[in-house]
Amino acid sequence: METLTLLWRASSSCLLVVLSHSLLRLLGVRCLEKSGAQPNKLFRPPCCQKGPSFARHSRCVYYTQSRE
């Protein structure tokens, strides 16, 4: 997970954020709104609302490891 975190921190453009989001979803990482519970918090991505993956979020989101 350290590698993913470093890659995320290194990416700053919206395009990379959306691509990273798609990759993380494939790896079983879920996106939750900032106001929700944050179990197993990995890292906090920059605010970015480009692309369909972020269309429903108006603020920064947290990524958590899916256990379902």
Curated annotation (Swiss-Prot):
Q: Predominant location of this chain?
A: secreted
Q: Which domain of life is it from?
A: Eukaryota
Answer yes or no on keyword Secreted. Answer: yes
Keyword list, A-Z: Acetylcholine receptor inhibiting toxin, Disulfide bond, Neurotoxin, Postsynaptic neurotoxin, Secreted, Signal, Toxin
Q: Where in the cell is it found?
A: Secreted
Q: Which GO terms describe its molecular function?
A: acetylcholine receptor inhibitor activity; toxin activity
**Where does the record place a coiled coil?**
none
UniProt modification remark: The 3 possibles disulfide-bond connectivities isomers have been synthesized: (C1-C2, C3-C4), (C1-C3, C2-C4), and (C1-C4, C2-C3).
> Which residues are connected by disulfide bridges in this protein?
C31-C47, C48-C60
List the expressing tissues: Expressed by the venom duct.
Q: Where is the signal peptide?
A: 1-28
Output a single Gene Ontology CC term carried by this record: extracellular region
Has the keyword Secreted been applied to this entry?
yes
Q: What is known of its domains?
A: The cysteine framework is XXIV (C-CC-C).
The family classification in the record reads: Belongs to the conotoxin B superfamily.
- Functional description taken from the UniProt entry: Alpha-conotoxins act on postsynaptic membranes, they bind to the nicotinic acetylcholine receptors (nAChR) and thus inhibit them. The toxin with a disulfide connectivity C1-C2, C3-C4 (shown in the sequence annotation) block the rat nicotinic acetylcholine receptor (AChR) alpha-9-alpha-10/CHRNA9-CHRNA10 with an IC(50) of 1.2 uM, whereas the one with C1-C3, C2-C4 shows a lower activity with an IC(50) of 3.9 uM.
Miscellaneous comment text of the record: The 3 disulfide isomers are poorly structured in aqueous solution. The toxin (with connectivity C1-C2, C3-C4) does not have inhibitory effect on alpha-2-beta-4/CHRNA2-CHRNB4, alpha-3-beta-2/CHRNA3-CHRNB2, alpha-3-beta-4/CHRNA3-CHRNB4, alpha-4-beta-2/CHRNA4-CHRNB2, alpha-4-beta-4/CHRNA4-CHRNB4 and alpha-7/CHRNA7. The toxin (with connectivity C1-C4, C2-C3) does not have inhibitory effect on alpha-9-alpha-10/CHRNA9-CHRNA10.
Name used for this protein in its record: Alpha-conotoxin VxXXIVA
Q: Could you tell me which species this protein originates from?
A: Conus vexillum
